[in-house]
Amino acid sequence: MMDTKTALPAGMQIDAKHVAVQDRVLTAPAIAFLAKLCRAFEPRRQQLLALRAARQKQFDGGMLPEFLPETRAIREGDWKIAPQPADILDRRVEITGPTDRKMVINALNCGASTFMADFEDANCPTWENMMEGQANLADAVRGTITFEQAGKSYKLGGKTAVLFPRPRGWHLDEKHVTLDGKPVSGGIFDFALYFFHNAKELLARGSGPYFYLPKLESHLEARLWNDIFAMAQKELGVPHGSIKATVLIETIVAAFEMDEILWELKDHSAGLNIGRWDYIFSCIKKFRVNRDFCLADRSQVTMTSPFMRSYALLLVKTCHRRNAPAMGGMAAQIPIKNDPAANEAAMSKVRADKEREATDGCDGTWVAHPGLVPIAKAIFDKYMPQPNQYGKQRPDVNVSAKDLLAFQPEAPITEAGMRNNVQVGIQYIGSWLGGNGCVPIFNLMEDAATAEISRSQVWQWIRSPKGVLADGRKVTRELFHEILVDELKKTPSIVGAEAYATGKYVQGAKLFEEITASDSYVEFLTLPAYQAID
């Protein structure tokens, strides 16, 4: 049981090791507010998670998603979302990262328009990380955040990025907090504490409580968030519509309901984002037993692959028809300081990616490293001199269900690609279990999505008749095990002694093998991994 100075609401228990900042995060009024939201909405969260499972059974039986006939009137109707607040009309470059103190300061200072402060995929949800993240964002909102490290001081500069925290997805619990004997929703926990402590302060400073919403699978899941927003604002006396949220379209099923998601959130919408890596993961996950579905090496599946191109263009068209921001996807590259040729090759990839997004009509884009902000900004400044390009309507874009489901390329699947999946999986899960969810791997800043693709591809290649390497060998459990053992031996020399000592790479490899060799597919690797951390 938590050693807390705060009286808990009836039915609530907190079972976690006390961390220094939690007494100012978990105040009595904040916890009461959290409990009220959880009691009001937890039954619906569970119903929606059950709907996900039922829908997966239909996909396993061969059904494919389609545009919903019952919501045709919404798709064909002439309506717009509520206008955007002044401070988020221009979002040309957004930086993403976890909520540790140094990252928050550097991200807010880096020249980006906004900072997606991540409680989700770039974060390992230890109790300490969740509590410190909330305290760090509260200090950032008030402009008081500072940090000292190795004789260097960090503090906020003059103009800072606008904050967009990302709470956890509907599938994740906050295991340290139970209400009436059951864990509370991780997403409601993250949202409620941030909103309670910061909404009025943000509004007083000319900004507002803005959020990114991950992993939605339907407009009904968007409706749940909208109802939470409406109740939260009413409870605290915050004007209705103050909350604005950008939904990451990062599941194949949500791509069929983009209009409906904007409609459900229209008082609270800040548009949609092209969540490319989780989107690929979702495609593999949803059609994992479909014998016709099998994607090539992860490196071959890019934003120019036909099904990815269709999804991105449909998102831009859908958003702009509703006067909503259409945000481009992540550039995960990290500047390579000791190899100018490799660095130039990486940066040229970033430039090509951002030029495509800007000319497609995106209103901004994501980067994972401050060093990429000037590159992305220069491109959007060139193609988008105005704050956004909502006016770029894209009447030329006509995307069908068939286009969204045209999953190519299927080849090549190579041993090198499989080894890369395994090595990335070992490194990411090993770091995550050590408390770090944002991990530099092979000059890319990776979050959970890349590890999800990696293990899902191998799981499917083992089971699909199309899971055959370019040299003719079938991918099997035995081949996977052989590669895993070999790659684990290489990990210490790749990550370095210091990182290897702080990570849990052997445990990570074991978990990677368990979930990949298992006959039943694990929906999210972070679910079993969460049980292994404090």
Language model regions located:
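Expand to "…catalyze enediolate/carbanion chemistry for C-C bond making/breaking, isomerization
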Residues: 2-534
